[in-house]
Amino acid sequence: MVYAHNLGFPRIGIKREMKKTVEAYWRGEISQQQLQQQAIELQLTNWKIQAEAGVDLIPVGDFSWYDHVLDMAVRVGAIPSRFKALNSNITDTMFCMARGQAPNGIETSACEMTKWFDTNYHYIVPEFTTNQSFELHHDDLFKSTKLALENNYRAKPVILGPLSFLWLGKCKGESFNKLLLLEKLLPVYAEIFEQLSSLGVEWVQVDEPILVLDLPPEWQQAFLTTYQQLNFFNLKCLLATYFGSLDDNLSLTCQLPVDGLHIDYCRAPDQLDSVLSQLPAEKILSVGIIDGRNIWCNDLNRSLTLLENIQSSLGDRLWVAPSCSLLHVPIDLDQENKLDVELKSWFAFAKQKVAEAAFLTRGLREGRESIGAELKKNEEVIISRKTSKRIHNPNVEKKAASVTERLMRRQHEHSIRKNKQTAQLNLPLFPTTTIGSFPQTSQIRCLRRDYKQGKIDDALYEEKIRQEIAEVIGIQVKLGLDVLVHGEPERNDMVEYFGELLDGIAITSNGWVQSYGSRCVKPPIIFGDVSRERPMTLRWIEYAQSLTTKSVKGMLTGPVTILAWSFVRDDQPRSQTAKQIALALRDEVQDLERSGVRVIQIDEPAFRECLPLRKAAWQDYLEWAVKCFRLASCGVKDETQIHTHMCYSEFNDIIEAIAALDADVITIESSRSETEILKSFEKFAYPNDIGPGIYDIHSPRIPRVAEIEELAVRALQYIPIERLWINPDCGLKTRNWEETKEALSRMVDAAKHLRKAFSSEKTPTIDLELQPAST
């Protein structure tokens, strides 16, 4: 029989119960027993939603209090030694690995965090050593599976496969071949399968998303040997791939001794024919035909026709599913009561997406007439979207068509610009700055909420925001920072804020998705041509600059990041949408410069995460991404200093594209990787200024002055002294004021020590063996 199933459901809860509960636990306001009870309630709710929608096989084990990769590391005992001695409680150990701090107050450096493939979700990077051992450590998966079965759900446990787990991890200390760990790791996976089998489970979903990447031959071979060795203890295994095409890994994937294969049709429709021709006759094919990464409703008529053709070849060996876990979309469109009615009809969130999968499955089982009403209603929606006049703006399209190469070049090269900027800004050696946002207190969040709900008027809102900006400027001046920011109190999110002010973009009320841990974001929905009617940031920056003689940065989010962190229209190339955003930002940049702003930051933290997963497609992306940044940033004079910021980036393979952005200063997130990212600059002479993040803002832990100095001096191995900036590694929005002021005070102290050590002597007086790079 054709089944409807799902790869994973959002964890956060319809009202973000997960966030509220886990943060209460971190604050010591609830017990661990209360924490676990909330986990049970959230999972039961998720399973009920899916079952009532008509999903046959319910994913179990997709819930996590922080991150599923972290859960897998803890489950198999891959707990770094620095955490083992700190916490006997496995839950607190997990939180300490993620945050550097457990609820019991014990601190150490957190594990590294990076992006999950090309999504905006972050995972905690497993750490492996040459003497790594593994053992079954955590029973959360088994408890959840038992709970689902006891509640009469047909449970399909979901785990990250052994090869993807190793690939996504990192060698700590001495480098070695991670594949050597398989011998110790596979017996633990076998234990997991044995316990699941003993519970009466029929199917297990093993996620191996790295099969859509360019894999070295030894990793391809490892798939064959690994899955031949794995003992599933009579469980049926659905091997799940997503985010791209199997491509050159298709043949080996079809050889693996598993019972079913899931493919992502939405991201890689061209692979379908090859998969059908190579799939062994006994295996299930799960077709991910519902887009798990975007919010547009499915064209059910078109999808059903495609699935009917597949069914004619496979019969009951066909399953229907979303393309990937629904972790990446909001939970329930029914919670949106402020969206424009026509726009809302075009959307589908997680609850609606599992219903779409169930509708299609019923159509395959019982014939089209069984879902005739749904098909008719859906067809009306699809036609409405295609013919709506609100999508296209002739003025925007004309402006985009008139863009020339000249608009994407600064007046002179960076060396000339730097001399002019140095004369104008009068900055010291090792200039200090922050990335943009400052702590957002509950009072600020309540202020914005009350303003949006009409509880306070424009005048009171303006007064309160100005008070906050004045306080932030005053704190920075007192701390001794060199280039200031206004703190962004008016912004709820660095992308959503601009989405609210740009035409062609819709904002939801409850469209939350998980970014990392308890942090949730509400991605804007780009439904049509994008344009700017009026300045978006000018009044706040002008006010902030009026309070100080020091430079205050204009703060913008770049075109690629707005694109990456939004749900994007799928009726034109993403590059065209990015160009429209860039043109809107260019107007804002020029308005800021005309008002006297001397430093403008255009954040592109998503620049690398948007890289296609296959290298063959990189060049095309990098070309249009660089052009869009330059289109946004190059309309200013030489004297205006352009900054950009990037997160979680490995620069080695795209360093030339980073340089091609031609930002005067780039700040990068590097503290958790212990400045390993800076090795990118070892062989490539990056010509512009760099500010490597020298303390981790994602952890509540406050670094010592000596730690900051050490990281800065390490950076000098790769960056000439006159080009090195001192800054945190990301915005400070999620930290509290006490942490922020103390950490920044230590950062400024470290910069002062560095100036003293390097300004008057050829060799630093700081007691470190590292020597600075030459110019």
Swiss-Prot record:
Keywords: Amino-acid biosynthesis, Metal-binding, Methionine biosynthesis, Methyltransferase, Repeat, Transferase, Zinc. Pathway: Amino-acid biosynthesis; L-methionine biosynthesis via de novo pathway; L-methionine from L-homocysteine (MetE route): step 1/1. Binds 1 zinc ion per subunit. InterPro entries: Cbl-indep_Met_Synth_N, Cobalamin-indep_Met_synthase, Met_Synth_C/arc, UROD/MetE-like_sf. The active site is at residue 698. The lineage of its organism: Bacteria, Pseudomonadati, Pseudomonadota, Gammaproteobacteria, Legionellales. GO terms for biological process: methionine biosynthetic process; methylation. Belongs to the vitamin-B12 independent methionine synthase family. It catalyses: 5-methyltetrahydropteroyltri-L-glutamate + L-homocysteine = tetrahydropteroyltri-L-glutamate + L-methionine. HAMAP family: Meth_synth. L-methionine binds at residues 435-437, 488, 603. 5-methyltetrahydropteroyltri-L-glutamate binds at residues 16-19, 115, 519-520, 565, 609. Catalyzes the transfer of a methyl group from 5-methyltetrahydrofolate to homocysteine resulting in methionine formation. PANTHER family: 5-METHYLTETRAHYDROPTEROYLTRIGLUTAMATE--HOMOCYSTEINE METHYLTRANSFERASE. This is 5-methyltetrahydropteroyltriglutamate--homocysteine methyltransferase. Its EC number is 2.1.1.14. Zn(2+) binds at residues 645, 647, 669, 730. Its cofactor is Zn(2+). L-homocysteine binds at residues 435-437, 488, 603. Signal peptide: none annotated. GO terms for molecular function: 5-methyltetrahydropteroyltriglutamate-homocysteine S-methyltransferase activity; zinc ion binding.
